[in-house]
Amino acid sequence: MLRTMLKSKIHRATVTQADLHYVGSVTIDADLMDAADLLEGEQVTIVDIDNGARLVTYAITGERGSGVIGINGAAAHLVHPGDLVILIAYGTMQDAEARAYQPRIVFVDADNKQIDVGHDPAFVPAFDIPGAEELLNPRIGAR
């Protein structure tokens, strides 16, 4: 049996730009793509924390170190700059692999800089990690 499992998640990133007239996709900082084990063209689900919108698109690599999370194409009608989003990728795997697989969960600060990487989708980093308090409200002191 094949199972579809959580493969990667970038948790509570801030949308930095939206371009309605781009052909589609989500632009993600190359550092975050690497941390989350996302490939150019990989399918991702975007969950907008602010308005509840959910959509499926594909990832394109943004400038390394820029913190860019750019919503492109028609999705820009649903997700806007400043919105908090969760970016999720799923993988299909055999049952045995699924039972042992550990997803990549990337936590970011208000500037979309990585502050932690883990494997437990229910875990929130300890507050002794610089920037972790922003996971509860990443807009603190950011805008």
From Swiss-Prot:
Its cofactor is pyruvate. GO terms for biological process: alanine biosynthetic process; pantothenate biosynthetic process. Binds 1 pyruvoyl group covalently per subunit. Its EC number is 4.1.1.11. Keywords: Autocatalytic cleavage, Cytoplasm, Decarboxylase, Lyase, Pantothenate biosynthesis, Pyruvate, Schiff base, Zymogen. The active site is at 25 (schiff-base intermediate with substrate), 58 (proton donor). Is synthesized initially as an inactive proenzyme, which is activated by self-cleavage at a specific serine bond to produce a beta-subunit with a hydroxyl group at its C-terminus and an alpha-subunit with a pyruvoyl group at its N-terminus. InterPro entries: Asp_de-COase-like_dom_sf, Asp_decarbox. SUPFAM superfamilies: ADC-like (SSF50692). Its main location: cytoplasm. PANTHER family: ASPARTATE 1-DECARBOXYLASE (PTHR21012:SF0). This is Aspartate 1-decarboxylase. It comes from Mycobacterium ulcerans (strain Agy99). The lineage of its organism: Bacteria, Bacillati, Actinomycetota, Actinomycetes, Mycobacteriales.
